[in-house]
Amino acid sequence: MRLCDTDIERHLDEGKIVIEPRPGVERISGVSVDVLLGNEFRVFRDHTAPYIDLSGPNSEMADAIDRVMSDEIHIPDGEAFYLHPGQLALAVTYESVTLPADIVGWLDGRSSLARLGLMVHVTAHRIDPGWSGRIVLEFYNGGKLPLALRPKMKIGALNFEMLSGPAARPYNKRENAKYKSQQGAVASRINQD
């Protein structure tokens, strides 16, 4: 069952869902909570690796990812990160989100931004039960013009669903959880699969 706005507010009040800093009621509507863009970004360096073999040895994948990913870029409040057409970048939500073992979250992009070519998550939009941390955004500009992205702009919306029961293996209890408690724009850790 998807949670409505009053259920979301109740879960926030009870501490079952934690969003820090807590959004005001003006950012909770219908079935979702608007989330804001954080200050941390990562981009791909051009021409630093000929390819990444996604089924190759883990050490080779890790080395290739380290070569192609930039260090984290911090954009101060009020300044902009420019995402150019055809560019993929990682960013992070301003808020940190914590979910219990019986709720799954879903991140949706904003239609107004998509109409300008901005994809907020290339594929990964599920927020696992037991998740705690900031949410990494996989931006892609499919439009014709560069897009200026500013920290604390509305970037997406989270909605939540109750599971039929608590997950037996929530994210925070899994030993192999690659992105547990992430706070920045963490690069791919596919080599840890």
From Swiss-Prot:
**UniProt xrefs under CDD domains:** trimeric_dUTPase
Q: How does it assemble?
A: Homotrimer.
Q: Which NCBIfam families match?
A: dCTP_deam
- Any one Gene Ontology BP term: dUMP biosynthetic process
Q: What species is this protein from?
A: Aeromonas salmonicida (strain A449)
Task performed by this protein:
Catalyzes the deamination of dCTP to dUTP.
Binding-site list for dCTP: 110-115, 128, 136-138, 171, 178, 182
The protein depicted here goes by the name dCTP deaminase
Does Hydrolase appear among the keywords?
yes
